[in-house]
Amino acid sequence: MTATLAAAADIATMVSGSSGLAAARLLSRSFLLPQNGIRHCSYTASRQHLYVDKNTKIICQGFTGKQGTFHSQQALEYGTKLVGGTTPGKGGQTHLGLPVFNTVKEAKEQTGATASVIYVPPPFAAAAINEAIEAEIPLVVCITEGIPQQDMVRVKHKLLRQEKTRLIGPNCPGVINPGECKIGIMPGHIHKKGRIGIVSRSGTLTYEAVHQTTQVGLGQSLCVGIGGDPFNGTDFIDCLEIFLNDSATEGIILIGEIGGNAEENAAEFLKQHNSGPNSKPVVSFIAGLTAPPGRRMGHAGAIIAGGKGGAKEKISALQSAGVVVSMSPAQLGTTIYKEFEKRKML
């Protein structure tokens, strides 16, 4: 079995039910496409768009809805450069003092937006992502939870065939550069500009790591919540590459959970790219150590199936890459602080 077909087989075990098998079959077809001359490696070029700052111009899809309105207000209060939003049929109106457009394409042309955040109900969220991809928005952050998995397989297939748009999520808290730009639902006040890059599959555990690194005085350089769904647009490796190449990021916290093999892949990446005297300290926590096989634990992707995806295997893989694994989420801040102390980086 080729590596690509093996990846599709892993997904079949990760997603339960007939919809999961159908999704895996569909994704396996997309994996086979490179044999027909279609390039998929180009999507990695969009990693650069993960870095947001005070100059990032954002639109909101689902702008006038309840969630879109609330979180757009929060973003504006934080100082994020929100320039407008879309709600089909409400183009030409204003909302929160900003213009409303019918389409993402129109919004991008009129505002020069470089990012979009999506607060659209699950049945329509995949179409919203596709619209942003077609408009070539550089960064798309989809907060929505509960998008049908087959919808996301089709979105991922579309993503992998282009290089202009980078997707974070779905089912994620978003991305934040403290003090500069907040795209998503994270509480802004717990963040502090600093030295730690945080990437996580869990939203609430992200906030825990943020609060602790703020408390120990290290702060955060960039925080990315990649989401807990099995078919997402950004994984650990995408974020790790940004962190390793970012001079402002001096240490990394990686928060994983049971299900899939993203943590094992991240460990392999760190072995290859973060070793030697100039390596950056990496601390991790893996949620679900006591989870029983076959039972989904919260997130759609958090399930041990087919003998794969267990916490112990993930912890071993990360430790073999030189990562310090904390056994408690309450100790992430003190653990990374001790690593800085040990390396005389304080």
Curated annotation (Swiss-Prot):
User: Activity regulation here?
Assistant: Inhibited by itaconate.
Any one GO BP annotation for this protein: tricarboxylic acid cycle
Q: Where is the active site?
A: H299 (tele-phosphohistidine intermediate)
Q: Catalysed reaction(s)?
A: succinate + ATP + CoA = succinyl-CoA + ADP + phosphate; GTP + succinate + CoA = succinyl-CoA + GDP + phosphate
**Record keywords, A-Z:** Acetylation, Disease variant, Ligase, Mitochondrion, Nucleotide-binding, Primary mitochondrial disease, Transit peptide, Tricarboxylic acid cycle
- According to its UniProt record, in which pathway does this protein act? Carbohydrate metabolism; tricarboxylic acid cycle; succinate from succinyl-CoA (ligase route): step 1/1
Family, according to the entry, reads as follows:
Belongs to the succinate/malate CoA ligase alpha subunit family.
* Listed name of the protein: Succinate--CoA ligase [ADP/GDP-forming] subunit alpha, mitochondrial
